[in-house]
């Protein structure tokens, strides 16, 4: 009896291994690598964090709380926002033949409400929702709503001109990353979009990006302050939505229009707020592997990447910032003051699209749709690397403009 039970237990393991090998893909390999690092982090935590990976394992879980504050309420409010914004945004975007879901992540990061809002606005067009929510939503939206406001709270006032110039250079290549990421999505997933459709949907994005670039060139201080106000406003709105959703769900008292945030789905038994919190948890269990992986990448390839920085003509701190960007741009901004002027420019330009590529954005994408992991990585890195090239070419002109302004 015990033997047959043991055999049955082993068959569960062997069958699951066989299924994994049979369905192997680039995405599944990336996920497996992260899960190996998750185990490394867990073991190191048990051993008292001797190698530093246990701390990164914990950071993955600790990220769930802040993510829930910015994500859960907006996931719950996505139907409300779509009801309010849809009638205004859809006609404008339809003029260009673009889907209104592109609006969501032009201004919002995927993990700050952009993804659920994009999916809601896209409706039955899942492919364009994924493209807007995860390709565009990991590049342009995070820059507007997160990177600029957060950077303003960390860097000195003297460095704000470098921030503006870097964002200017970085935004130029966002459409390139979106096109490449969209093509990769069509080639590697079930979500198919033609190049013509991708280009058509990027028209409003290109127009908005161009206006921002022009604004940053002619009135950088006003534009940067405007982004700061916008970021603060988004935080306020997100907090209000979260508070309303929680109040409704706990008390059962509903408000007009907002009642959809707490109504349980008949099939899943989950309310939109429940779904938002579940999504945060799913992202967190990926981050507990992603963060130790990034730590290993930084330790292993940091030296080589710093040599690349030297080839670009930037100092050691700026080279270290490039490596930090791959996980989280906050670490980069913390050493911003120690960088040389060109290093500051290149770091911000790279951060516009490439920041979080192996950190939060990888974890978020894997948490909501594993099939999109590779297209997102490809799109972000292409946009980030081309931004470095553009920033390097524009550096003499941009830096002289900053110097003359001072």
Give the ranges of each region predicted by the language model.
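Signature of multi-pass transmembrane helix bundles
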Residues: 5-73, 132-137, 144-289, 366-406
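Interfacial/capping segments of alpha-helical transmembrane domains
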Residues: 6, 81-99, 254-264
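Juxtamembrane/interfacial segments flanking transmembrane helices
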Residues: 48-53, 85, 297-304
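Short amphipathic alpha-helical coupling elements at transmembrane boundaries
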Residues: 55-66, 90-94, 303-314
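Transmembrane alpha-helix boundary signature
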Residues: 76-87, 117-125, 184-188, 250-253
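Alpha-helical membrane segments and immediately flanking helix-loop junctions
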Residues: 96-176, 315-369
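Long, well-ordered mid-to-C-terminal structural blocks that present hydrophobic/aromatic surfaces
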Residues: 257-317, 321-330
